[in-house]
Amino acid sequence: IVELAKKLREHAALEEIRIIPQIAYLAARPDEISCDPEKILYLPSHKECRNSKKQFAEHFRIFEQKANSSNPPVMAEPADAKEGITVVVNPPYPLMTTEELDAVYELPFTYQAHPRYKGKSIPALEMIRFSVCLHRGCFGGCSFCTIAAHQGKRISSRSLESVTTEIARLATLAEFRGHLSDLGGPTANMYRMQGRNPALCDACNRTSCLFPVVCKNLDTSHKSLLELYRTVRNIPGVKKATIGSGIRYDLFVNEKGFLNDEGKQYFRELVQYHVSGRLKVAPEHTQDNVLSMMHKPSFALYRVLKREFLSETKRTGSRLQLIPYFIS
């Protein structure tokens, strides 16, 4: 948006504006597409998708796979055959680095609603006022979800220092009562997770790093997240920090139990310190054939999670509930 605003302020030619990454525009003629024709990936047209569910599904399959690749192409969809109009979508900007993401959160945000809402209650704002975003992106690849289309498949994480600085700033606000309602992101427990070998990620066409099996190249360590949780618990003014974002339990359990001791420790500390009363997870369905279509793990993993949850609450004597979400 900033780059587009700069170009408009400079009265730049449309040809210059059309090459800005991450924008979409309508082209009335082929020569209005500001790109080498050989580098354009044409998707099934709007008319084809409207007339055929298979074409619509194929359109989304291509878009999802190519948009999540390391070097996505310019994508074009013929929108109006009669008028010759084509929708053109440019590739996104590169993934934000930790330093770039930290710089965003260093900006002088007021954490207040616009002055026009003075004296009015905004329920949506109250729900997230004291939540803290740890990272962007999600590699879950659920077939019904568009998070990867919005934020990408790879994780871009803030530094521990950036997170703790923001929390210390929140703790000085008069409205803060000591409760952080979320330490999360699109998926709460993907903080700092990435491929061990980036070159393998660059060559990969999978839309999910977790389905049908967890990728062997994926580093699923919860070490950085555990360090962050422990640090936050000791920040002056913070009485409780709960996790409001969803977690992917297939990152630390399988049908046999915990994948490793680190995953077990993560779940223990999550339940003991970071659940306000109900831990919400999303198995989405109970039948494995349906879950397979949804790119979700077997319901057997939820049963394992429930067993371990009940065991942990019994061990600590806590009265917590596990709430499963289902798509109806």
Give, region by region, the residue ranges found by the protein language model:
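Cysteine-centered iron-sulfur cluster-binding motifs in ferredoxin-type domains/subunits
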Residues: 130-143, 154, 160-162, 166, ...
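N-terminal pre-triad scaffold of radical SAM enzymes
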Residues: 118-146, 177-179
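Glycine-rich beta-alpha loop elements in corrinoid/cobalamin-binding modules
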Residues: 1-82
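N-terminal [4Fe-4S]-dependent radical SAM core
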Residues: 57-131
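Conserved SAM/AdoMet-binding glycine-rich loop
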Residues: 169-328
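Two-component system phosphotransfer/interaction surface
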Residues: 2-13, 98-105, 168
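Hydrophobic alpha-helical scaffolding
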Residues: 90-94, 124, 128-135, 149, ...
